[in-house]
Amino acid sequence: MKADATRRLLSMDLDDDDERAEWEEWGNRAALERSAPSLSIPELFAEQVVRDPGAVAVSCGGRSVSYRGLDEASNRLAHLLISHGVGPGQRVALLLSRSVEAVVAIMGVLKTGAAYVPIDPSVPDARLRFVLCDAGPVVVVTTAELADRLAGHGLTVVDIDGRAVYSQPSAALSVMPHPDDVAYLIYTSGTTGTPKGVAIPHHNVTRLLE
């Protein structure tokens, strides 16, 4: 500072090497800078199923499900969704509360190669209508209790707890999505107040898990 009295404080690096390393660890900068792995979310999940199938994958509301159980349940849903024409490049809306079933639905959609569009059941009807019209899902996965909110939208509705899901095979699908495929479409409020959909690819998620 004495050497250059005109130098601005904002241009000076006041952290030592140890402090900089600590800041980078807190910000997970390494995850953002390293190249994305060549795996999709279902591929990373499949590796974990093989590695520790009996471990608890999800716990919510007093319920727990193992990686094997989550894998088989999501496979059943994926097979049913495919029978309804769901596949890569398409979107499936999820009108579900936070629950074990919601995680099953997410994995089931991802295994088809489609992207999921999460919708909080607490949103007003106007917001629900906007997201459904804007996202253009081919199927909506929900529960019997929430199905009435989808009346009049002309969409195929799948009950996550329905007999049609449980009658499907639990065998794995033969094709996995590409890491560059869109994993999900999340809607933000937008600067104008109009919800805006942001597409997130698989590799944006998996690089944080490596």
Predicted regions and their residues:
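Carrier-protein-dependent adenylate-forming modules in NRPS/ANL systems
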Residues: 1-17, 29-206
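Intrinsically disordered, charged and Pro/Gly-enriched terminal/linker segments
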Residues: 17-24
